[in-house]
Amino acid sequence: MAIVLPDSILSNPGLSYIRRMVLRRAYVIASVDLPRQTFARSDTHTMTSVLVLQKFTEGERRMVAETGRPPEYEIFMAIADRVGWDLRGNPVYVRTPEGEEVLRKTTRNVTTRNAKGEVIEISKEVEEAIVDDQLPAVTQLFENWLAQKSPRWLHV
């Protein structure tokens, strides 16, 4: 399961009971910090993180209750600085050191009319700016980490 939490819940000393509750009930598989502009298009500028969790089995919960602490394990952690738009929700594109937008060629299907006036669909090669979004790369890194680690405790 994945949850989006305000960073204040993850770092506020007065809310440590929430963090303890999570650690007594689930493995934190991943923690990904998101930039302030992540939810800017929803008029929210709260710093947030995504936590990927896996609930403990009943046996694991009993073990945590008996020992008073969760087991030790590795956690995937990442920080995404860019999500494809700025604080106002405007698109942000990858740029060269000189400030020019980086373009890539791609094929698009375009609906048009032929000489007879019939509606047809054609493939057209176009150049488009690349959205500056790190989340696909973070996702790929997480998938690679999972494949490499294949944690023994991960219940798929």
Q: Would you name each region that the model predicts?
A:
Residues 2-156:
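A conserved structural/catalytic subdomain of Rossmann-like adenosyl-cofactor enzymes
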